A protein has these predicted regions:
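Charged phosphate-binding loop/patch that engages nucleotide di/tri-phosphates or the phosphate backbone
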Residues: 142-167
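Amphipathic alpha-helical segments within well-ordered protein domains
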Residues: 51, 92, 134-135, 151
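Mid-chain, well-packed structural core segment of small domains
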Residues: 93-137
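Hydrophobic/aromatic-rich, well-ordered segments within soluble, folded domains that form packed cores
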Residues: 53-88
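Extreme N-terminal tail/first-helix region
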Residues: 9-45
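A long, hydrophobic alpha-helical segment
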Residues: 43-55
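Residue-level detector of well-ordered alpha-helical segments, enriched
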Residues: 59-66, 103, 126-133, 145-149
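Short helix-capping/linker segments at secondary-structure and domain boundaries
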Residues: 73-79, 138-148
Length: 167
């Protein structure tokens, strides 16, 4: 009986070990320390791909949260929370960042230059996120780049939830 119990325990330990090996990586956990470095790290490998997809007129991989960020409180997934901007000050810092601001302007320009609609490029859910992002940065930027995307893609209509969160 004792041998059977030990064998069963060993089998359970092996199964647990292999389940750990095969388990998918969990989504990032929300954190209190919101350094912009989280965006730089996330964009390191994916930004060139994201830009290529927008220029080709079709988003096919998953990068919307850290390429076109929106305010925290609009999305409920771990990624939306983790990459959500805390407010207008963090949005200003994002836009002023030498890497992040340059990339956001570049990929936003690619959206403007596309002959595709936002829905064709991003699909329904991510089009909503794009509108939130463009609304936020149109409030922050001194130029009209982000407002021009709102005009082109959303008939000039800002995202009301973003404006509400901004106060």
């Amino acid at each position: 009986m004792e041998l059977i119990a030990k064998t069963m325990k060993s089998i359970k330990e092996l199964l647990a070990f292999f389940k750990k090996k095969e388990a998918p990586k969990p989504e990032p956990k929300p954190r209190l320390d919101h350094s912009l470095e989280r965006f730089v790290v996330a964009q390191e490998l994916m930004y060139p791909r994201a830009l290529e997809e927008v220029k080709n007129g079709r988003k096919v991989t998953h990068w919307i949260w850290y390429i076109f960020p929106q305010l925290k409180g609009l999305g409920h997934s771990n990624k939306s929370i983790y990459y959500g901007l805390d407010g207008i000050e963090e949005a200003r810092a994002f836009l002023a960042h030498p890497i992040l601001g340059t990339r956001l302007r570049e990929i936003t320009t690619a959206v403007l230059q596309s002959d595709k609609t936002a829905d064709e490029i991003f699909g329904g859910i991510d089009t909503i996120k794009l509108r939130s992002c463009m609304t936020l940065f149109s409030e922050v930027a001194e130029d009209d780049l982000f407002g021009r995307v709102l005009l082109k893609c959303f008939e000039g209509k800002s995202d009301s939830k973003t404006l509400e969160l901004l106060g």
